[in-house]
Amino acid sequence: MIKVFHYTSPGVRTHVANVYTSSLEEAFRLTQNIDGSWSRSQFFEDGEENSDFDNRVELLVPLIQDDNGKIFGLRSTMMFDEMELNGKIYVVRAAGFALKSITPFENINPIGVA
């Protein structure tokens, strides 16, 4: 399993998802909004299938809903976000990943509030 952390504001990273794979590249791909929303359910409110849904992705944060009931998914994983695999932290780079440290975050904000 890979833990996905999004950089939500300066100095604040939030554990947004667990992705059940052992490949950093696959975890990155599965947390991209390409033809839908990786963080939304299999079907949208209008019944249309969400082609970015994958049951290997476990969302850990609530999605935002506006006053009209419209639900907004999370952004795609991008450069400088981080992933944890086997206790090691990897930073997403323009091409690939860079090892950050061997110690997982100790002060993670689980719900994205500073």
Regions found by a protein language model. Give the residues of each.
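A sequence-composition feature that detects small, non-aromatic residues
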Residues: A17, A27, A94-A98, A114
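Short intrinsically disordered terminal tails
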Residues: M1, P110-A114
